[in-house]
Amino acid sequence: MQKQKCSLKLYTNFLIANQNRYSGLELSRVSPVEDLCHDSVSRWLSSSNFTPSDLWNQVKSLVDVKTGYLLCDDTLLNKQYSRVNELAKKQYSGNEHGLVNGICLVNLLWTSEDEFIPVDYRIYRKEADDKTKNDHFQDMLIRAFGRGFSPLYVLIDSWYSSISNLKLVRKFS
């Protein structure tokens, strides 16, 4: 059996370093690994099962939980050309100003203003877990404070400014 060219360390470093384009094609283009192609990345991802805890274990040494800011926002990974993808569904995209087939990620990042490090995430699939994006935000914030985070500020998009979210932020201030 051929050794996998992609690895968790390579993929995590790619996600941290690349602030704009998160695709297997982009990783294969910028990778220091010789002959890493989009198909290799796709095979590796499909054979792997990662959790938010795996992400945290990879990045916690890069984060100073006593400083910086926590930033929460969601992003839609456009999958308009994907025929079969159980995570993708029609969702509103602010970038496209309309419905797009895609995967919605709710992300929690730590930033020191100079760098942005993802520390937690949730895949938004209300039909699978009956959770809203606000529920995911609250779960991630509670987990972050449980990990010892004490940010200067928690920065959120106005979509996350519900009374219950703001009370939770204030509770940890």
List each model region and its residues:
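A short acidic (Asp/Glu
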Residues: 81-83, 162-168
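Gly/serine-rich nucleotide phosphate-binding loop at the start of the catalytic core
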Residues: 1-50
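Acidic, metal-coordinating catalytic cores used for nucleic-acid/nucleotide bond scission
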Residues: 155-162
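Active-site-proximal, Lys/Arg-enriched surface segment
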Residues: 47-115, 125
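A structural signal for short, well-ordered beta-strand segments and their strand-loop junctions
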Residues: 69-72, 118-120, 153-155
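Short, surface-exposed basic-aromatic patches at helix termini and helix-loop junctions that form
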Residues: 61, 146, 166-173
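Electropositive, glycine- and tryptophan-enriched low-complexity nucleic-acid-binding patches
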Residues: 37-43, 95-151
